[in-house]
Amino acid sequence: MEKPVLQTQPSMLPFFDTAHAVNLLRGIHELRAERKFFDVTLCAEGKEFHCHRTVLAAASMYFRAMFAGTLRESVMDRVVLHEVSAELLGLLVDFCYTGRVTVTHDNVDLLLKTADLFQFPSVKEACCAFLEQRLDVSNCLEIQDFAEAYACRELAASARRFVLKNIVELAKSMDFERLSWKRLLEFVSDDGLCVDKEETAYQIAVRWVKADLQHRLHYWPELLQQVRLPFVRRFYLLAHVESDPLVYLSPACLRLVSEARSFQSYEYDRHDRPGHRMRPRPSTGLAEILVVVGGCDQDCDELVTVDCYNPQTGQWRYLAEFPDHLGGGYSIAALGNDIYVTGGSDGSRLYDCVWRYNSSVNEWTEVSPMLKAREYHSSCVLKGQLYVVGSDSTERYDHTIDCWEALPPMPHPMDNCSTTACRGRLYAIGSLTGEDTMAIQCYDAESNRWSLLNSGELPPWSFAPKSVTLNGLIYFVRDDSAEVDVYNPQKNEWDKISPMTQVHVGGSVSALGGRLYVSGGYDNTFELSDVVEVYDPSSRSWSPAGRLPQPTFWHGSVSIFRQFMPLVQSTFEPIDIPEANAIHLHRHHRNQALHNHNNNVNQNHNQEVNQVH
């Protein structure tokens, strides 16, 4: 016979009334309507509001401090408030009892100020939401100032984003011309300034200065520093920027123009000396991309694919395939926004051919061959010219005349060296031929001479080392280790950074956007990898940056700028391409103005000298 199952009675029953808060608020509101249990009266502009201390203290930290502290108001039955109108105090008292308030165009400013004073954060947030919905070109600057004055961070950020997005329309208004110097500098320096091309940013800056030239001229050089002149089109830089008296009468401004010209002629190394001016605004559609060329897949089949990765979108795109058999042992380098692939072999013969990828038309063309066929060499760009370095020879390519010239070879031949340009010199890092120790040699283009550097203890030997320049430092990535060494040419010292998350045997290294990208190769488990990881010098840490389109090794990678569709289409004003005669005329006017300016300076100086005598 089965024993009966005994049912145990629960010892407790947790209960939560979801309607309790609503019912409690309703009850408090009813007590107020019935005028029961009032224990304090608030007065403003002669009008009285009968309230409950507990309700006020629960709704506002201001009133909690008033009634719970040692202030005399804590024991007073009648409290006079001088900082608020009766109408706004009534709105806040009603809010304490109902949780409701009506924000209007007429009361929003004062209501926000009052809510901020009496510490009603939710009312303040409601006012901010109302103002954010009403943002337009006519009030965005005023709302941003107002939001910052009352620590409304989200509203201030929204107003700032609105200004940056609508800067072209805003620049046509009188409010823009009255903009403070500090505020304008913030806008023009922001990456988020929404212009279709950098010329528009220049025009906006010029308009503000010329609106009050006498009082704003001294701000101009610093303001021009925030314009990304390297990305202003060449004809505009010559015919509109350099020819403007604001620019050519200022040595500081002329230096900025010279920097832009150097960048556009590929003499300026943006990786060696990065800066905000070398970074295009996203709205222009110009993006710095990572380009991966060739390599081998998992079956060791040769790839002729060319893929590009845009860090802004996190997407890969196909570019024009390499038109010929790449082979192995080739080298890749970026000269401006063009990519050069040099040499290599098919296993039986060496190549002397050189292929150039023109990013503006997405096309590969063959240029003049090297003076010597070679493989497993290294190439890099120094001062706008392409250098190819082998164990026993060096040559240089001038893209303007499509011509190669022989240079002195390294005094100490190197096997599988890696080259990079840093601080105006070319550095080759590798193992000396026949030795298993690493060495570093330096080429000075001014003296046309190589020298072997004594840089202390170098990194261990590596079969296929890779080096890249970033922020004036040379990052050295070994082929068989996750460790990364850094060489400082100024101090002639080596250091280490955090190791990579995995090894990249046969991987590739490049600099992009002020960060270091390492991709592909075989990992710690000898599996072919598609991992791309990135090193950020500011945080001194590695992080994942996506994956290659497929696992790849022995590929090349470089970074270039490539034009995509601008995010905005409107322009500040029409810009016509000047004819050649017009450019010559601009040059003549500029030279004439400089001549007149110098004459005036000399005359003033002579007058001062005569007065002294």
UniProtKB/Swiss-Prot annotation:
Leader peptide range in chain numbering: none
Coiled-coil residue spans: none
Renumbered ranges of Kelch repeats: 289-337, 338-384, 386-424, 426-472, 474-514, 515-562
Any one GO molecular-function label of the UniProt entry: ubiquitin-like ligase-substrate adaptor activity
BP terms from Gene Ontology: cell division; chromosome passenger complex localization to spindle midzone; proteasome-mediated ubiquitin-dependent protein catabolic process; protein ubiquitination; regulation of cytokinesis
Pathway: Protein modification; protein ubiquitination
CDD domains listed in its UniProt record: BACK_KLHL21, BTB_POZ_KLHL21
InterPro entries the record matches: BACK, BTB-kelch_protein, BTB/POZ_dom, BTB/POZ_KLHL21, Kelch-typ_b-propeller, Kelch_1, KLHL21_BACK, SKP1/BTB/POZ_sf
Pfam families assigned: BACK, BTB, Kelch_1, Kelch_6
Recorded GO CC terms: Cul3-RING ubiquitin ligase complex; cytoplasm; polar microtubule
Subcellular locations according to the entry: Cytoplasm, Cytoskeleton, Spindle
Segments forming domain BTB: 38-105
Top-rank taxon, per record: Eukaryota
Principal location class: cytoplasm
Domain BACK: 140-242
Oligomeric form and interacting partners: Component of the BCR(KLHL21) E3 ubiquitin ligase complex, at least composed of cul3, klhl21 and rbx1.
Function: Substrate-specific adapter of BCR (BTB-CUL3-RBX1) E3 ubiquitin-protein ligase complex required for efficient chromosome alignment and cytokinesis. The BCR(KLHL21) E3 ubiquitin ligase complex regulates localization of the chromosomal passenger complex (CPC) from chromosomes to the spindle midzone in anaphase and mediates the ubiquitination of AURKB.
Protein known as: Kelch-like protein 21
Species of origin: Danio rerio (Zebrafish)
